[in-house]
Amino acid sequence: MRILIRNTWILLLGLLLAIGVSARTRHGNDVVFVSELPPEARHTLQLIRQGGPFPYEKDGVVFGNYERLLPKQNRGYYREFTVKTPGVRNRGARRIVTGGELNSPRELYYTEDHYASFRRIQE
């Protein structure tokens, strides 16, 4: 009986810790510094700042934030840009999502798992 109670408490503690981690990443509170990004992401940032040209037709389209992982904003606030993935023939899973003005965004987010999680890019 004691083992069952102990295991239940361990399980509950694990769930609480997992929920805490999820809440931190939900609104992009996890941070990645530009210097920590893969070189392809740094190149995409450079293209965003200079206004292109972008290698993919869908770069710069409105990102709907349907996953609701980023802070809520009006439609059109967020835009997405592809980060090339070496060895992948399609667009891959990596993206930079910007918020605000197209060429001078106020917010930058990086996802390497196709919108399952985001990290805010810190200059």
Region spans (language model):
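Functional cores of ribonucleases/endoribonucleases
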Residues: 55-123
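Small/flexible residues
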Residues: 4, 8, 26-28, 97
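N-terminal secretory signal peptides
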Residues: 23-72
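Bacterial N-terminal signal peptides
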Residues: 3-20
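Residue-level detector of functional hotspots within protein domains
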Residues: 7, 18, 34, 39-42, ...
